[in-house]
Design a protein with these regions (language model features):
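A short glycine-rich, Lys/Arg-flanked "PGG" loop and its adjoining helix->strand segment in the class I
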Residues: 134-146
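Conserved SAM/SAH-binding loop
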Residues: 67
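A short SAM/SAH-binding and catalytic strip from SAM-dependent methyltransferases
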Residues: 114-134
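N-terminal auxiliary segments of SAM/dcSAM-dependent transferases
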Residues: 1-22
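Conserved SAM-binding strand-loop segment of SAM-dependent methyltransferases
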Residues: 98-108
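Conserved SAM/SAH-binding beta-strand->alpha-helix loop
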Residues: 87-88
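SAM-dependent methyltransferase
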Residues: 11, 146-206
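Conserved alpha-helix/loop element of class I SAM-dependent methyltransferases that forms part
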Residues: 40-59
């Protein structure tokens, strides 16, 4: 990984913001990811993110913390947050912005337990493939304290496969339709392609049942997205 996301965050933090990140997938054309959006405050966050932050309780793990916006909001509420990201640049920015407990780490490296685990901005993305979902969910389950919760958002992207007549052109012989090849470039540098997973709610719920987690659809967004709360079976 070249960490172009981290470089973009560092450039913005250091006053060197001149252009945005360009993204695309194997089923969509190029799009712009505005870097200022990654530094948004609570009032500018989508309603699903706002809802998730309002549901937070206890000791928190912010997974894929990026520039630290969610962590800073919670810190300012007096909540203790551990913030992790695989991007060294992102964690450097978090430290500069005053995030108290930020470190470069993968979720699979974490062993301590939390009351709330946050996975936002398509939190299922880090699962990569449908076949990996139960592995990640089992690990996340092991990180929950009794009465703990996982707050995670994603989208059902089936709509991206609709043709003009409303029919679907999903290849039934291909992988799950939410598994995408995700491409990023910044200032002419291309990131190593990622596999990024968008997961419809029913598929997430079924995977949770497999590993012994309850899965509740807390709120639906305006564009096939949703916020789910996962809890331990009592």
């Amino acid at each position: 990984m070249k960490d172009i996301l981290g470089q973009a965050l560092l450039d913005y933090q250091n006053g060197n913001y001149t252009e945005d990140i360009i993204t695309s997938t194997n089923i969509s054309d190029e799009d712009i990811l505005p870097i200022p959006y990654l530094f948004r405050e609570f009032k500018d966050m989508p309603k699903l993110e706002q809802k998730a932050l309002k549901l937070v309780k206890g000791h928190v793990l912010d997974v894929g913390c990026g520039a630290g916006g969610h962590s800073l909001y919670l810190q300012n509420k007096g909540i203790i947050v551990k913030s992790i990201d695989i991007s060294e640049g992102a964690i450097s920015v978090c430290n500069t912005r005053g995030v108290n407990h930020a470190e470069v780490a993968s979720i699979l490296d974490i062993t301590e337990q939390f009351d709330t685990i946050l996975l936002l901005m398509n939190g299922t993305g880090i699962f990569e493939k449908l076949s990996y979902v139960t592995k990640y969910l089992s690990h996340l389950k092991s990180l929950l304290k009794p009465k703990g919760q996982i707050l995670i958002d994603s989208s059902d992207i089936q709509y991206m496969y609709e043709d003009e007549d409303g029919g679907l052109w999903i290849d039934t012989n291909a992988n799950y339709y939410g598994e995408l090849d995700y491409y990023m470039s910044y200032k002419g540098v291309k990131e190593t392609p990622l596999t990024w997973l968008y997961l419809d709610f029913e598929t997430l719920k079924n995977a949770c049942l497999t590993v012994g987690l309850n899965c509740e659809n807390v709120q639906e967004g305006e564009h096939f997205d949703y916020l789910a709360k996962l809890t331990l079976n009592e």
